[in-house]
């Protein structure tokens, strides 16, 4: 009984360590984003002294000056948290690689604070500001890596090894996919509605809202440069985007119809059930492609080229080459989701710029953190279909760890985007709050390891990106 109690107490203490480490990491991230915001609002110039304002000890004379002071106070608190986290890790005999990584972050922290003090006293200096930004993001990334490693050790299955080949064959021993009755209703009106719903399903409408938000964010970012955003350009770009997504989804249905019949969650798709004839679906996809390219061409030729590339990449490169052949299909395939950011930017500016590339990078890095949750939830289904998704090939423990890693990289890229595009407080709050929520559910996934937990993390990833994209639109158009 005493041994069981000691084990339970140790598990609780380790959970607290993970909570403290995650809180410290997000605290560092908060400092980075608030620091970017203070630079944007010239708050640092309103309090150009250290540790407070004026002669070094005077109170601020303006609201933005108080923002700078608040940033420094929070920096002290987070620094204390970093030291406490390291101390708790030592007390709990956390594994060596985690302790070393946390120690590196704790060692870099006062150096980072000193650079911040120099920036505050000497005023804005590009070199020092870049060093300060990179330093803060590096500390955050270091702590996030330590968190992922510790969660892997404490919650992972030590017996789990890579037993599945890099390209698994469809597993015939798994339960068969459920039967689905494709019969159309006898009533002509109901039959027409059922057919219409089937064609709508081919376009994968659930993907459209988020990818349209990505394109919208790209357009509004482009409008802050030399670009001009008009209602006509916005409507044509979003219309072309919706149709290109629909075309890509339709071709995906066509090419995966045989595999869809083997998988539980896709066995009721229109082509898998012969609800829509294959050649009709192909013609439908071609029609959507043509109209999409026409709309993009009306905006500009580069947008049309990128739209065509997006359709080909998702339909051919991802569906035929990446998804069935490599465990890195999700990572490389993230380029398909990133292209709408460039299309939105190009639609307004006419060329590819740093802002569009920065937003595309955020989407690219977010994709594995987002989709690996779905891969965990449907691991058995993907194995049945013969797809080498990470949980199938490398195991669930490795996949959960990668969710944390890719989330951390996403937040780093989001911080870089805030700096490049001078985004404000709304963006900072959205990225911090929803990033913390995503991290919370990703950590919870490590402990619960259920399908429901994977879906919670999946939905949290959607909420994060949606909130960040809306914040970009708000910051660029309203503020």
Swiss-Prot record:
Pathway linked to the protein: Porphyrin-containing compound metabolism; heme O biosynthesis; heme O from protoheme: step 1/1
Region described as Protoheme IX prenyltransferase: 208-476
Source organism, top-level taxon: Archaea
Keyword Transmembrane helix tagged: yes
EC number: 2.5.1.141
InterPro entries: Protohaem_IX_farnesylTrfase, UbiA_prenyltransferase, UbiA_sf
Annotated stretches, region: Unknown: 1-207
Gene3D superfamilies xrefs: UbiA prenyltransferase (1.10.357.140)
Chain spans, region Disordered: 155-186
Pfam family, one: UbiA
GO cellular component entries: plasma membrane
Family: In the C-terminal section; belongs to the UbiA prenyltransferase family. Protoheme IX farnesyltransferase subfamily.
Protein known as: Protoheme IX farnesyltransferase
Species: Haloquadratum walsbyi (strain DSM 16790 / HBSQ001)
Classification lineage: Archaea, Methanobacteriati, Methanobacteriota, Stenosarchaea group, Halobacteria
Gene designation: ctaB
